[in-house]
Regions:
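Phosphate-binding site of ATP-dependent enzymes
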Residues: 117-206
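Active-site nucleotide/adenylate-binding loops and adjacent lid/helix of ATP-dependent enzymes
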Residues: 33, 41, 50-152, 202
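A short glycine-rich, hydrophobically flanked beta-strand micro-motif that places a catalytic Asp/Glu
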Residues: 142-146, 155, 217-228
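A short beta-strand motif that forms the metal-chelation/ATP-contact edge
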Residues: 31-41, 155-159, 230-244
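Protein kinase-like catalytic core scaffold
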Residues: 106, 164-165, 232-235
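Non-cleavable N-terminal signal-anchor transmembrane helices
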Residues: 1-36
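C-terminal active-site "lid" helix and adjoining low-complexity regulatory extension at the edge
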Residues: 195-199, 213, 226-269
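Anionic group-transfer/hydrolysis microenvironments
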Residues: 111, 147-148, 157, 223-225, ...
Length: 269
């Protein structure tokens, strides 16, 4: 999918006609100017740079949420060896190896990665060394998590401390094995479905609203996982992408359009 083919481009062009704001596009439609504000990718000129930076750092997000008693999936920060000098304290391979011995299975991923790319499950030292070398070749830092079995994943979109949408990311009907790394990303084939259970909506909303308040972000999508009956924040995204959601059917397209309409109005006020 090229930048021009993104639904957000189509939606914003429609909204410009309906709402009467001017738009310009730059960088092959990756940047959209709306009146005197900018949308870069899926990041609206609504959030502070600090809040956005926290969201783009998986380990920092975990630390902040955990420090404020918000249940989140553990992410531990490790800098690549060539950049470790900037930490002011030593990090070494032994620390990572000890985590593998403790938890048996570890998940390794880029600390600022997106779209479920370059995520690896390891359960022995040879795999660990191989994956660490690969990741540190391409990324300055990684996040390491104890493996957890995820039963379900939800996305909650929040604007100005109000929940706008909650949907689950349902996996296609495939056989799953215990201790298997499963990606619930929509771009990897998961199917969005709006959550209608009122009790679940209340629980997810409560967690998401606490998370965005602590981070201080105005427009975000919060991913929450159900692991053995416990709800945990997986990550908070400062870029609100609804491409795959909006492509499911016309109803979902109009919902996404309504959220982007509200976000632009909030941005321009």
């Amino acid at each position: 999918m090229t930048n021009t083919e993104r639904n957000i481009i189509k939606i914003i062009k429609e909204l410009s006609l309906e709402e009467g704001f001017a738009i310009q596009t730059f960088s092959f439609d990756w940047i959209i100017k709306v009146n005197d504000k900018y949308i870069v990718g899926y990041n609206f000129d609504i959030n502070s740079s600090a809040a956005s930076a926290i969201c783009n750092d998986k380990a920092a997000t975990y630390e902040i949420l955990n420090a404020n008693d918000i249940c989140a999936v553990e992410h531990n920060f490790f800098m690549s060896p060539k950049n470790a000098k900037y930490l002011g304290e030593e990090q070494d391979y032994t620390e990572i190896l000890n985590k593998l011995k403790k938890y048996k299975y570890l998940v390794l991923k880029p600390n600022n990665g997106t779209s479920g790319e370059d995520i690896f499950l390891v359960n022995n030292e040879d795999e660990l060394k191989e994956r660490l070398e690969l990741l540190f070749t391409h990324y300055q830092s990684i996040a390491i998590s104890p493996f957890i079995n995820i039963d379900k994943e939800y996305r909650i979109i929040v604007l100005d401390n109000e929940v706008k949408l909650i949907f689950s990311k349902n996996l296609p009907n495939t056989t799953r094995c215990c201790n298997e790394l499963v990606k619930f990303n929509l771009c990897h084939g998961a199917i969005p479905e709006i959550v209608e259970d009122e009790e679940l909506i209340s629980k997810l909303s409560n967690i998401a609203l606490k998370a965005v308040k602590i981070i201080g972000i105005n427009f975000a999508s919060v991913d929450i996982v159900d692991t053995e009956g416990q709800l945990k924040v997986l990550e908070v995204n400062s870029g609100v992408m609804m491409e795959h959601f909006s492509r499911k059917n016309n109803e979902y397209y109009e919902i996404a359009k309504g959220i982007y309409r509200d976000a632009i109005k909030f941005m321009l006020k």
